[in-house]
Amino acid sequence: MSKLMLKNALVNGAIQDILLEDGIISKMGPELAADTATVLLEQEGNLVIPGFVDCHAHIDKSHLNDKGENKYVHGTGGEKGALTRIAKAKFTVEDISLRAERVIRDAIKAGTLILRTNCDVDAIVGLKGIEALLGLKEKYREQITLQIAAFAQEGIFQDGKTPELLEEALRMGADLLGGHTITCGEGEKHIDFILELADKYACDADFHLDESGNREHYLLPYLAGKLKEMNMEGRVNAIHMCTLSALSEDELKKAIELILESRLRVTIAPTAISTRKIAPVKALLKAGVPLGLGSDNIRDFFNPLGSGDVKQMALLLSYLQAFYSEEENAAIWSMITDGGAKLLGANYEICPGASANLTAFSAKTPQEIISMQLQPSTIIRSGRILNI
């Protein structure tokens, strides 16, 4: 494999050269020497990172609106869910693969290195989505890390088949479980089942938790207590948590204490603003809650827009909750880079011995990249320059 050297890259806060050999970062430092066999890539002091991290998506249901019969309509979450179920009944492995692959390729082009997606598992679609996404995970394994959560979108106990399907999804190779506590009207029982199965298979769990924004759906106290009871603190990522925005100041303080005690990680999906308030991100950051950002739905019945470029979510959240100062810009940047990677338990570093995964920009600051929605100037994965 030929050697690559990025010259004068802004990385880890300093201008350095980065030598890549055999898919690994072999050396870093100022003014490294290069032999004639080394391909030089001048960066002119521009920013280089490993890549972006998208902590939550639904790529198995992406691009449904691209099909003529699937038109977006304004309506309630229940109505959109019903339309999705009609579409899911027609899913094939090939269909899911084609639509999901489009998101994966677009995400890679945008600089995404790590993507966690939920994948519906139920009596309607069976394990078709899991089969399709596992194939894509292998196909693109040198370009992007794909984490797959077997997701109980339609609930667990309504059809008598979903419990076994979720377990089979884990046996097939799904990385973790996904719970949807609002769906079946049995939120506590839903949490119990997902945690018990996750414990059995020693995997983590994602929960769409308190996503309605309504106080009657507030399940954080129950989940936190269950995690403590089962000694599973630190193994759950909570998505949305919109109900936090409906709490009083004192209630929010107590909620954050529960989040910290249970070592809960939280992923914000800013597009939820279309139907309810999103969680108070600044309060969570101030308390030290691990946070990530996710694209969530992409061009389907729940969201007719999006592309799988998580920078869009960073810009949207910046506007929605006034992340404007230098310190606040840095917090948003961390949610789609190192902080997001930590939330997902993924490797994320540029240092000698690390995998040669680098994403370069014609920009010197994160603020410029987010503001201008800049695409990478160069993408390197496993030591190879990508042309995708």
List each model region and its residues:
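Histidine-rich, glycine-flanked metal-binding segment
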Residues: 1-5, 10-49
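Divalent metal-coordination and catalytic microenvironments
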Residues: 9, 23, 45, 56, ...
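Di-metal (Zn2+ and/or Mg2+/Mn2+) metal-binding site signature of metallo-dependent hydrolases
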Residues: 46-68
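Active-site gating loops and adjacent loop-to-helix segments of metal-dependent hydrolytic enzymes
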Residues: 63-96, 201, 219-237, 255, ...
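Alpha-helical scaffold segments that flank or form the walls of functional sites
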Residues: 65-118, 124-139, 164-171
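Histidine/acidic residue-rich metal-binding segments in metalloenzymes
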Residues: 128-142, 159-237, 243-265, 275-293, ...
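His/Asp/Glu-enriched, well-ordered alpha-helical/loop segment
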Residues: 204, 226-236, 282-361
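C-terminal cap of metal-dependent C-N hydrolases
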Residues: 352-388
